């Protein structure tokens, strides 16, 4: 080997990668320590337009990058060494794929002559993420003659990560030793104008004739719904509100849709349907003729059952990502069109035929929302004991305008859906609902905190925190401000609501999984301010104090058996109130 020529090619190679990332809008690179990734780690660390975020654990690092990409609305990159380090990125890649979050996965590897022959820290990394990435390429070892190909590959990769449906891409990067590039030569390359290849994603649209035909048909339907599921495109709320007013249809807004909270919210925006759609009389009486669906499948199971109860309704899925987020198999029309463009164009097409005043259908849904919300608030807010529903019923007034609430999976996201109703103050509610896992939640939330300048609160269950306790290290390493609202019911609370709860002889062992962990030492380990809040005033005071900065862990303890009672007491109260208000019988 000609070492001088090798280092020259290596330096140009990794410099071109760093320049291409920056030229294509990547600003953040999450780096895990390792030897084989040395050349690229040094390049991204020295590039003036890239910021490096060190992370010691690859699984947490992947989710941290995912959170940053969510916050920025642009791809983040994550770099790791070869071997099992790569495999640890799989959970985050799966989530990014299903949640349509743009990630650029950069994995160092051994060169071909060291693969599949027992070389240390070497595994088969070719296609390791399978169908969970938008694109995979196993790049050649550094070669001066292939620099144009490298730049084209980087531009293509970032472009694919950003294009609808956004998602992860994987670049596998073999490097031979020696691994240290020429520092002075790299600095000179970075001072030159980069010759990067760039890709501009396009928006999907439909023809004017098709849109006019749709508008004409929608005018004929008085009993319509707009459903905004998780992960709607940013800033869709005001456009959906305008469309709802044109059609006189209520919006059933999932808390993770970005539509339930903000100054655009008015009486058309409903957030308590998870409660009143448990009422069989309402479900049977109010059959929709048409349903316009945006985003992923909603969190609410009662809403899913409602749609299944009315299979003959015309369901139209609007998906700018041209994917398939329709597990019910009820929708017979799928429009692969940019959601923003669609809402504006359809609202314009409906302007001349807008209905006068609210319809009886709209009034019934708005009344059901107001009735259920009143019952829930009047039942939960006077309660003295700390409950999981009561916590989310209070968070709407406790969180400051513009805050980010990251909700964990299992019970927290469901309680957020049911009990944290619409509000006009901006609130950004985020969760990992791609694969619905409880892994990587702390790291995702801290990635959000790193990528934005808003107060961040993560509401997590105890098992979720234990799953990703390593992720807390990022808060200390990068001096991040974040509040963990820990809902500790000593195990898997959601199983108490499922049929498994009847298996009493094995329930605690297999499903309840009590652990008895004391979280105070965990907080101390990571220099977090710890509070065990035993009443509502203590929770409120600790939450407000946490917004002064730093990492805070506020623990509230609940009982799983009482939690079931707290939930199941509410549903008959809502049903009775609907009946007394005369809402359960269609007019």
UniProtKB/Swiss-Prot annotation:
GO molecular function: 2-succinyl-5-enolpyruvyl-6-hydroxy-3-cyclohexene-1-carboxylic-acid synthase activity; magnesium ion binding; manganese ion binding; thiamine pyrophosphate binding
Keyword Ion transport in record: no
Xref: Pfam families: TPP_enzyme_C, TPP_enzyme_M_2, TPP_enzyme_N
Pathway assigned in UniProt: Quinol/quinone metabolism; 1,4-dihydroxy-2-naphthoate biosynthesis; 1,4-dihydroxy-2-naphthoate from chorismate: step 2/7; Quinol/quinone metabolism; menaquinone biosynthesis
Keywords tagged on the record: Magnesium, Manganese, Menaquinone biosynthesis, Metal-binding, Thiamine pyrophosphate, Transferase
Reactions this protein catalyses: isochorismate + 2-oxoglutarate + H(+) = 5-enolpyruvoyl-6-hydroxy-2-succinyl-cyclohex-3-ene-1-carboxylate + CO2
Chain segments annotated as coiled-coil in the UniProt record: none
InterPro entries membership: DHS-like_NAD/FAD-binding_dom, MenaQ_synth_MenD, MenD_middle, THDP-binding, Thiamin_PyroP_enz_TPP-bd_dom, TPP_enzyme_TPP-bd
Example of a GO biological process term: menaquinone biosynthetic process
EC number in record: 2.2.1.9
Cofactor comment: Binds 1 thiamine pyrophosphate per subunit.
Cofactor annotation: Mg(2+); Mn(2+); thiamine diphosphate
CDD domains: TPP_PYR_MenD, TPP_SHCHC_synthase
SUPFAM superfamilies with a match to the protein in the record: DHS-like NAD/FAD-binding domain, Thiamin diphosphate-binding fold (THDP-binding)
Family membership: Belongs to the TPP enzyme family. MenD subfamily.
Assembly and oligomerization: Homodimer.
Function: Catalyzes the thiamine diphosphate-dependent decarboxylation of 2-oxoglutarate and the subsequent addition of the resulting succinic semialdehyde-thiamine pyrophosphate anion to isochorismate to yield 2-succinyl-5-enolpyruvyl-6-hydroxy-3-cyclohexene-1-carboxylate (SEPHCHC).
Name of this chain's protein: 2-succinyl-5-enolpyruvyl-6-hydroxy-3-cyclohexene-1-carboxylate synthase
Organism: Chloroflexus aurantiacus (strain ATCC 29366 / DSM 635 / J-10-fl)
């Amino acid at each position: 080997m000609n070492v001088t020529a090798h280092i020259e090619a290596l330096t140009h190679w990794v410099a071109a990668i760093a320049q291409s990332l920056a030229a294509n809008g990547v600003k953040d690179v999450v780096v895990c320590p390792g030897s084989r990734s040395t050349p690229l780690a040094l390049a991204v660390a020295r590039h003036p337009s890239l910021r490096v975020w060190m992370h010691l654990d690859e699984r947490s690092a992947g989710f941290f990058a995912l959170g940053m990409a969510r916050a920025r609305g642009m791809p983040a990159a994550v770099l790791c060494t070869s071997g099992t380090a790569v495999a640890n990125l799989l959970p985050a890649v799966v989530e990014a794929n299903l949640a349509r979050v743009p990630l650029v996965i950069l994995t160092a590897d051994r060169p071909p002559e060291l693969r599949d022959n027992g070389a240390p820290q070497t595994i088969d990394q070719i296609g390791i993420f399978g169908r969970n990435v938008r694109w995979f390429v196993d790049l050649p070892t550094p070669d001066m003659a292939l620099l144009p190909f490298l730049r084209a590959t980087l531009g293509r990769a970032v472009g694919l990560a950003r294009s609808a449906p956004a998602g992860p891409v994987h670049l596998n990067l073999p490097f031979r030793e020696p691994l240290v590039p020429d520092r002075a030569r790299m600095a000179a390359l970075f001072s030159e104008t980069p010759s990067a290849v760039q890709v501009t994603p396009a928006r999907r649209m439909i023809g004017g004739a098709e849109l006019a035909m749709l508008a004409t048909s929608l005018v004929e339907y008085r009993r319509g719904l707009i459903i905004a599921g998780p992960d709607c495109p940013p800033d869709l709320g005001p456009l959906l509100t305008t469309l709802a007013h044109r059609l006189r249809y209520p919006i059933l807004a999932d808390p993770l849709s970005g539509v339930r909270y903000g100054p655009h919210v008015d009486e058309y925006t409903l957030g308590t349907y998870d409660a009143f759609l448990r009422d069989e009389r309402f479900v049977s009486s109010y059959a929709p003729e048409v349903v316009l669906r945006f985003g992923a499948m909603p969190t609410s199971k009662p809403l899913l059952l409602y749609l299944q109860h009315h299979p003959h309704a015309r369901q139209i899925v609007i998906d700018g990502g041209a994917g398939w987020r329709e597990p019910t198999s009820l929708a017979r029309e799928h429009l692969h069109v940019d959601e923003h463009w669609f809402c504006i164009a359809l609202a314009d097409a409906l302007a001349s035929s807008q209905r006068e005043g609210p319809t009886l259908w709209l009034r019934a849904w708005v009344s059901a929302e107001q009735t259920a919300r009143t019952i829930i608030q009047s039942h939960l807010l006077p309660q003295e004991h700390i409950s999981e529903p009561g916590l989310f019923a209070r968070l709407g007034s406790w969180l400051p305008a513009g805050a980010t609430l990251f909700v964990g999976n299992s019970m927290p996201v469901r309680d957020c859906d049911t009990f944290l109703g619409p509000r006009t103050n901006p609130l950004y509610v985020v969760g990992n609902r791609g694969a619905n896992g409880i892994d990587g939640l702390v790291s995702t939330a801290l990635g959000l905190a790193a990528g934005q300048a808003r107060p961040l609160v993560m509401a997590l269950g105890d098992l979720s925190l234990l799953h990703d306790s390593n992720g807390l290290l990022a808060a200390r390493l990068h001096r991040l401000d974040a509040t963990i609202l820990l809902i500790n019911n000593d195990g898997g609370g959601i199983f108490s609501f499922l049929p498994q709860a009847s298996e009493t002889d094995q329930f605690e062992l297999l499903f309840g999984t009590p652990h008895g962990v004391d979280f105070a030492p965990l907080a101390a380990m990571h220099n977090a301010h710890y509070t065990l809040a035993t009443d509502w005033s203590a929770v409120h005071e600790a939450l407000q104090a946490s917004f002064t900065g730093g990492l805070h862990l506020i623990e509230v303890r609940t009982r799983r058996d009482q939690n079931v009672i707290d939930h199941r007491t509410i549903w008959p109260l809502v049903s009775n109130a609907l009946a007394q208000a005369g809402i359960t019988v269609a007019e």
